[in-house]
Amino acid sequence: MGRNHIHKNRDKNKQKLPQVPDALKRETDGVYEEYSTELADADDREAQERAKAADNRAKKKSR
């Protein structure tokens, strides 16, 4: 057995690696949690408004 025997075993391992679903590959849109607006304080509401405004600016810029 030569050195090539070691490399054959190493290369077979690539077929057994798990695949990542496409849903996990995509980046998130920045929204990680859902909660009631009644529970949100003023800072949370302000941050949500700023995030929506930034999203709208980005969408307009990309068109």
UniProtKB/Swiss-Prot annotation:
This is Uncharacterized protein YfhD. Residues 30-44 have a biased composition (Acidic residues). Residues 45-57 have a biased composition (Basic and acidic residues). InterPro entries: YfhD-like (IPR025435). Residues 1-63 are annotated as: Disordered. Residues 1-15 have a biased composition (Basic residues). It comes from Bacillus subtilis (strain 168).
